């Protein structure tokens, strides 16, 4: 049976953290809850785990009322943002702890721990003290301890958020393999994150959450290609998708003093005023382009993010190399208009380069 939630609501003081959330999580699948900070991700995971009791709604699993099952009987493993390990135990002992609590045979414990160590890339570290490990290695220990429990539900609450950029990239690539190969077909994996790149890398089903509400549910590729509205477009892109208020006139897209040829997929729009959306990666430096002024330059890993202005227009472009720019430098850019999106004045998707619409 699936893990099914219906109309879950939870209020903290006077603020609603969850607003009638429903879900249907199938066994053997990986799900990503994508949302900004304070969107309700942690609250939802804690509600599933039994650490919080919803004010209304229901959760059923294997045809049982999950809310009536005590926390210790729910067969759930949870990995937190912080590296939660037992400092007085070595790596092997940390991972073996839940198995020893269950009184398993020592040989069985040994086999399961070494299987888990191999899966998370910590072979040879079994005798190390926790204090001797890097942040990434400590989080791998937390994941390994969760895997050996062979829990039916594995919850991961932003497990990469406290790691440095390079380590996040490395673990992001490894985690999908860990979850796909490390769990049985009877398990459900629910991974929460603020980072759309993690959601795309894991490539499971994505639930976009904002202010305690589910905005959109779908395959990672579908969410990325066809965000249903401006909120989803902002949450599912990093940096957020650029949005410009534009007009259409004489087959041109116009804003400020800029005119762009209208691409085929936007040529039949009935409304002459709309929100023009374009990703930072679809704006390129071009010596024959439109001149903008640098407001801020950021280095993000191996990329350079340029915050640019022209009149009242503000945009961000990403360059796939580290470059040196100063504030008020002039740069010229082109928009890849064939990659552009159109959202109506209330924010719904009208047209995407992938054929999607929400009107």
Regions found by a protein language model. Give the residues of each.
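Helix-to-loop junction immediately C-terminal to a conserved catalytic motif
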Residues: 49
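Non-catalytic connector elements of ABC transporters
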Residues: 241, 252-359
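ABC ATPase nucleotide-binding domains
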Residues: 75, 90-228
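Conserved coupling/switch loops of ABC nucleotide-binding domains, chiefly the family-specific signature
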Residues: 53-58, 211
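Conserved ABC transporter NBD signature motif
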Residues: 57-65
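The feature captures the beta-strand-to-loop junction immediately N-terminal to the Walker
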Residues: 34-36
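A short, flexible loop at the N-terminus of ABC-type nucleotide-binding domains that lies
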Residues: 1-5, 9-20, 68-70
